[in-house]
Amino acid sequence: MDRKLKVGVLGATGMVGQRVLSLLENHPWYEVVVVAASPNSAGKRYEDAVGGRWKMTTPMPKAYKDLIVMNVNDVDAVAKEVDFVFSAVDMTKDEIKAIEEAYAKTETPVVSNNSAHRWTKDVPMVVPEINPEHFAIIESQKKRLGTKRGFIAVKPNCSIQSYAPVLNAWKEFEPEEVVVTTYQAISGAGKTFKDWPEMEGNIIPFIGGEEEKSEKEPLRIWGHIEGDEIVPATSPKITCQCVRVPVLNGHTAAVFVRFKNKPSKEELIKKLVEYKGEPQELNLPSAPKQFIQYLTEDNRPQVSLDVDFENGMGVSVGRLREDTIYDYKFIGLSHNTLRGAAGGALLCAEYLTAKNFIQAK
């Protein structure tokens, strides 16, 4: 790489946009040159546009404070300045679909944190350690969009990161039925306790749309490319309940699994700790050295002890044991705004850069 790639962050003032910017500070491959947000923020210094709404636990990086926020709707103006963009915009689904396609059509690759395009037939939805081969569908997408280098790639929902990688590590034993309950942090809703005081000491047994995503998205990730589309897998059957809990960061999952070929507990643990994907082989800057860790203590994984494993990019598993109804049960934990959101998108971008899908304009 002759120079760092120039990056724009769309939706830069929101919580996920802030997290993306924090991760891009001092990145070896990328340099943020554009922060874009709603017309209300456009024209202001980034620090002024965010005001008192900086939600990260680390200070706002100095390099971004004086950047003048561009209007996210000025697609051509933003596209002229950047090699690619991260999308974390807060709009309706149809608006997100339209604006991400508009950027792609200016020959600007879009790596999206949003759900709008997750079921667009030729848009890859990727966890780089699980299904990087789905990025091959980008060639079909470019034909549809009429582009040479512009495309959209997305990362999946934050809720599935605590169990989909685990089940993927056990694929050869053919999981057939999976029952999941997720316990999801408030940052998944873009909130802190300051914004959402009624969550303190409270549990809300419903998160809109989350259960459907948690049941269906893993099947698309385990699907295959057929012609110009990604065809989802048909198994395992997954049923899920999603609960909002009074935790700032970290989604926990309690999971029950039935296998076609029941393995031993030792075999399952071995598969977890030995699991490596292409990001590890390629030594991508944001890739965890160890993707999944297995903890033997009865009281692990815990959010307060384990959520930052591998800088929030690893998955922690514990309490694997045989079950009285299913074959096995376990607890999984992942960082919802790192592995589950901004970090997952950044890892996708790094993989796409390493494989020359994203290049300097």
Segments (PLM) and residue ranges:
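Charged docking surfaces used in two-component/phosphorelay signaling
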Residues: 187-361
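N-terminal Rossmann-like NAD(P) cofactor-binding subdomain of oxidoreductases
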Residues: 1-205, 237, 309, 316, ...
